[in-house]
Structures are given as C-alpha cells and as structure tokens.
UniProtKB/Swiss-Prot annotation:
UniProt-annotated stretches for the region Disordered: 1-23, 82-111, 641-682
Residue segments, region Interaction with CDC31: 171-682
Any one GO molecular function term: ATP binding
Modified sites of kind Phosphoserine: 189-190
GO biological process, one term: nuclear migration involved in conjugation with cellular fusion
Nuclear side stretches: 1-154
Name of the encoding gene: MPS3
Subunit structure: Component of the linker nucleocytoskeleton and cytoskeleton (LINC) complex composed of at least MPS2, MPS3 and CSM4. Interacts with HTZ1. Interacts with REC8. Interacts with CSM4; ECO1, EST1, JEM1, CDC31, NDJ1, MPS2 and SIR4.
UniProt source species: Saccharomyces cerevisiae (strain ATCC 204508 / S288c) (Baker's yeast)
Biological role: Component of the linker nucleocytoskeleton and cytoskeleton (LINC) complex that regulates telomere movement and meiotic recombination during meiosis. Connects the spindle pole body with the nuclear envelope through its interaction with MPS2 and mediates meiotic bouquet formation and rapid chromosome movements in meiotic prophase. Functions as an integral membrane anchor for telomeres and is a nuclear receptor for the SIR4 pathway of telomere tethering and gene inactivation. Essential for nuclear division and fusion and required for the first step of spindle pole body duplication in G1.
Effect listed in the UniProt record for changing residue 477 to A: Defective in spindle pole body duplication at 37 degrees Celsius
InterPro entries associated with the record: SUN1-5, SUN_dom
Subcellular location: Nucleus inner membrane; Cytoplasm, Cytoskeleton, Microtubule organizing center, Spindle pole body; Chromosome, Telomere
Entry protein name: Spindle pole body assembly component MPS3
Notes on the domains: The SUN domain is involved in the binding to MPS2 and is important for modulating chromosome motion events that act in meiotic chromosome juxtaposition and by extension, promoting proper morphogenesis of the synaptonemal complex.
Amino acid sequence: MNNSNEHRREEAGAANEQMPYNKAVKSAYADVLKDKMNREQEISLRAIKKGIYTDGGETDNYDMDKENDSAYEMFKKNLDFPLDQHNDDDDDDPYIEDNGQETDGYSDEDYTDEADKSFIEDSDSDSYDLESNSDFEENLESSGEAKKLKWRTYIFYGGLFFVFYFFGSFLMTTVKNNDLESHSSGATSSPGKSFSNLQKQVNHLYSELSKRDEKHSSELDKTVKIIVSQFEKNIKRLLPSNLVNFENDINSLTKQVETISTSMSELQRRNHKFTVENVTQWQDQLVKQLDTHLPQEIPVVINNSSSLLIIPELHNYLSALISDVIESPGIGTAGSAESRWEYDLNRYVKEILSNELQYIDKDYFIQEMNRRLQSNKQEIWEEITNRLETQQQQQQQQVQQDYSNVPQQYSSILMKRLIHQIYNSNQHQWEDDLDFATYVQGTKLLNHLTSPTWRQGSGVQPIELLTDSKQSSSTYWQCENEPGCSWAIRFKTPLYLTKISYMHGRFTNNLHIMNSAPRLISLYVKLSQTKEIKALQTLANQYGFGQHHKRDRNYIKIAKFEYRLTDSRIRQQMYLPPWFIQLKPLVRSIVFQVDENYGNKKFISLRKFIINGVTPQDLQIIENNEFPVLLGDTPEYGVTQNTDEGKRKVLLSKPPYASSSTSTKFHPASNVPSFGQDELDQ
C-alpha cells in the first residue's frame, strides 16, 4: 500500500509540475502575469496595425481574455482552498507518513498558512511595478467590473503605443538633425581643404586648356606655313622671271585701257557734229551763267591806254565756266557753277593805290563780252574744230603705238633745270618785295610802346627782331607775359601797306619756344596825317574795330590775326581788311600786340614780322610809267647755266599795273610746286 501511494504521489507530482501553482509562488505568479501582459500587448498591436475594430474581432479578443481570466481565477482559488475536493477513489485512503501519522493523499506541505502568507508578502514586495495591476487583480474578483477593466487596458496600451510612436519619431528627427549638423560642421570645419581642392582642379583644367590651345596653335601655324609655302611656289610658277619689266608692261596696258575708255566716253558725249549753231547755243548758255553768278560790280584794271583788263581770278573763273558749258552732255542743263566767284583785294593793293583797279557794272561787262564773242564766233568754231581733230588724231596714234619698248626716262639735264627752276621760284617768293621791318631800311624801335624783356630769358632784346639776316633762325625775343605783349616800330618814310606776315619756326624738342608762340595778334596803326585818323576810326568802328591802344590813343586797331602752329607754313600772312585797302591810308608806325599765346604763362616768344609796302615815290613812278614792269622768267639767284636763261624779258604788251603776285599767274615758274625745306607760302 505504501508502494502504491508512493507511485501515485510520483505520478501526481509529475503531472502537477506543469501547473503554475506547483512552482514557487513568486516565480509562478510572475510567469502567469507576464504571459497575460504579452498576449494583451500582441492583441492590441495587431488591432492597431490592421485597423480591425469590428464586433467580431472584439468578441474573439473578449473570449480569449475571458479564458485567460478564468485560468488566473483558478490559480487564485487553488491558492485559497486545499486540494482535498476531488472524486478520485484511490485517494480516499489515508496516507501514512514515515513518522506514522495519517494524512490525506493530496495534502501538500507547501500549501500551508505560512505559504499563503509568504505568497501575499511576495506579491506585495514584487520587483515589478505592478501596483496598478494588483488593484486590477482585486477588482477582477467581481465579474461585473471585468469588462470595464478590459477597456481601460486597451486605452492604456493604446496611449502607451502612441507615446512610444511619437517619442520614436522625435528621436529619429533629432538623430537626422544631428547628422546634418555634424555634416555641415564637418563641411565648414574644413573650408580651406575644399577651396584648395577646387583651386587644384581649376589649375588642372587651366593647364589642360593651355596645353590644348598651344597644340592647336602649333598645328595651325604648321598648316599656315605649309599653305603659304605652297602658295609662294604656285605664284613663282605663274609670275615671270623679270618682274620689273612685267610691272612696266602692266602699267602701260593700264594706261592704254584708261585712254581708250576716256576717248570712248568723250566720243559718246560728243556724238553730235560741231556747228555754228552749237557755238551759238554755248554762247547763250555762257551769258546766262554769267548773269546768274557774277556780282553786280566787276573789278577790272584800266591801264594808260584806257583798255579794260580782267583780273586773273576772273580769267580762271571764265575758263572753267566755258569748259563746263562745252563739255556738258546737255545744252539746257550745262554750265552750272558750283560757287560764286570770289577774289582777294590783298593781291591788288598796288593797283588800288595807283587808281588802276576800278569797278564796272555787270550788265555792261556781259554786253561787252557778248559783243566780242559774237564777232569772233567763226574763229572760235574753227579753233574748236581744229582742236578736236588734232585730239582725235593723237588718240588714234596713241592707241596704235607699241608700248613694248623701254619706257621713256627724263634727261638728267632736264632734271637739273627743273630743280634749278624750283629753287629760283622759291627764292623769288621771298625776295620780290622789300621788308620794311628791318633797321637797314631805316625802321626804328619804339621803346615806350614795347613791352619789357623777360628777365630770366635768353637775353635777346626786341631790337633783334629788326635784323635782316636769314641765318637767325634761333633768334627769339622773349617778352613778359603781361596782358598784351607789344612790339612797336616806326618807318623812316610813311608807307602804303601791301602785305604783313609773321614767321615762327617749328621745333620737335624745344617745346618751350612752341608753347610760347603767339596765337592771337592785334594790329594797330598810326597814320601819317592826323586829319585822317577820325575818318579811319569811324570806318573801323563799322566793322568791329577802331579801338585805341592802351599806351597811346593815336594808334587804332584795324585787324586781328591768328597764327596757327598746326599749319605747315612757317610764314603766314596777316590779311588787311578790304575797307582799309580801299581807304588807302599812309601809315607812319605800327604796333603788334600779342593777346594770347599757346599756353606758356611766363613769357611770349617772337621771331620775325615781315612788312611789305610801297612808298609814295613808287606810286609816282608807276603812274608816270617811268620804268617798265619786268615780267617773264624768274630771276636767277644761283649760278646761271647759260647766258640766254638769265635774261629778263621786258613784256611791253603786259600792263604796268600787274604786281609780282599777279604776274606769277602768267609764267610757268609760278606753277612749279615747292618741296623740302624751301617750301614757302603762296
């Protein structure tokens, strides 16, 4: 019996080892409570993720929770009641312990009052924070409050889930921000390294581009050299060996083509035959043009024979107008002059002083000219016909001429004569009139009207400006740059002024002479007869002049001149006003006043004034025709080449009124151009 009891107790112990109440109280309670909490958490998580809150789901969860609660209640009851209430018949027999005492078969020493007490104490001192759960357990004793506890549990775990969810998202955001800040701080912590890396990359790219450009340029240079060499080879093959002769041939052919084209164009324009009627039409057209463009008063020269002579400017104007009328393609629109005819009275001061320059009415001039053209119409027609025939013959001969010969060359003798003629022409432009601004002509300096000399200058006195030496190109008088630097002279014999000029050098390095050169020069004159001063002043006031000099009121301002350093002419003329020329006053002394220079504020540099004029004795000789006017060839200032070239021809047919400037229009020497350092003014 004892063996059977022991066997039964072993089976009961093995079967009851799996039950929570067969374990230690503390561990059993913790396992059951943990299992329940895990199941409730899994159920709430699945419900939140899937969003299943239907009635069926709530029912299932409620059944599962009910089963769990019943198991938990059973465990509690087993703890409160002894295990003697069972229907097993085998357990009715008392169990005899080793000590001889009888006990029930299912009694256990573990389930004593002390065990219950220890279970309660262990549950109160449990390490888990389950105070709320212990309260929850007490409330489960009543079945009416179980349902409320279930919903509170759901709300609690749902709130806990949301707290964990937001806390996790906050942690993730914080981590990301920390990563970004660490990244930015890491980026900003090493700006030098980033800049150096960028600089290295840029330098590398620049070096690559430079190498590429050098490579392309070298390849381009090689290609260009090859092309140029090939081009030179091809050109050398095409060009003849003697390039000079080839160039001469090309020039000759070009001239032939130009000549042929000119002759053809002229022949096309002149396709009509010259007749007397055409000449009459030209005459009528010429008269109309003269009537339109000529002024109302025509200046002419009347010599001793009372014959009318036109001045050279009018002669040139008529020649150009006649050529324009003849060469025009149509008669009706031919001969339109570009501008009105103008002339300069400064060229005819001598003729005005001798009363040879007079004015006639335009109608009388045109009538006289028309009468002479009418009487010589046949002669003009014959002359034109002969000239055209001669020109056509020359053109035909020129076209048929062989230009393959050696081009013509100038003779060395002809070249020497041409150079000699140019030299004489230039020299004669300087020597054709006396310079009265020299002390050798008796002119004296007026010290009381002359400005003081600049003390820090070269020491040249104003009297040096009266020297007659052409070698004194470096002689410059420097006066103080006071308001109006003056230089005054007095003639030995009163003069009729014909031309006044000033001469100043051109220097490349000595710029203090250039910026102190006079720019604006005023001319003051004192008349020989005091009774004419008032008339001169009244006339000058009408043209904006007539002011008195600040040091002497007897000197009257008649002109103002601007000397231009930009002009290549070193000798520039101070033109006399026409009203002064027509008044014909006799001048006793002159004052030149420099109103402005080219920028020097300390001093003004003056070199040379040239004054040309005629005396009353010269006019008397001209009026009486006591000495013939010498015209023709230019006088020889150098060595004569033969006796015939040095002769002066006396042209008695020419009127005695012509001056040197006027006579140069009638001989070839005046038309020869000047060159080099000998270039002088016209």
